[in-house]
Regions:
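Feature captures the catalytic ectodomains and active-site-proximal regions of enzymes
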Residues: 1-132
């Protein structure tokens, strides 16, 4: 679990340029970390989401659904290597990680209280696949 408060703070400050730069920098750091972990922890579940939205225009929490993405580390690694994963993953056509696009994905919208049970179910399914 990693919580990065700076993204929220920059939203409260209405500082769009620095917020974009911070998100891009974090994206690079997470990508590098996942590549390193991928050598050892291929079945690790990777989840990216937020605990709430902070609207840059009003500088306060806005209570829209947060974008949420989940994958196995092995699938992330295959994607970054340009491999075809069509047989390996439940995919959708979402091409951008934002509130509107992610809500249109296969996960749709769901309350945050369901996240842990959802992840437990994914973990159990991975164990079943690996044992067969």
């Amino acid at each position: 679990f990693v919580h990065i408060k700076a993204i929220d703070d920059l939203g409260h400050d209405k500082n769009l340029d620095d917020r974009i730069t911070m998100i891009e920098n974090i994206d690079k750091i997470i990508g590098g970390t996942l590549k390193t972990l991928g050598e050892t922890y291929r079945d690790m579940i990777v989840v990216v989401g937020g605990d709430h939205t902070t609207n840059i225009h009003i500088g306060d929490h806005s209570f829209e659904p947060v974008p949420f993405i989940v994958t196995r580390l092995e699938i992330y690694k295959a994607l970054t290597n340009g491999e075809d994963i069509s047989r390996e993953a439940l995919r959708d056509n979402v091409q951008a990680f934002n509130e509107i696009d992610c809500a249109k994905g296969v996960l749709g919208r769901f309350p945050g209280s369901e996240v842990m049970e959802f992840l437990k179910n994914i973990r159990q399914r991975i164990k079943q696949i690996n044992s067969s």
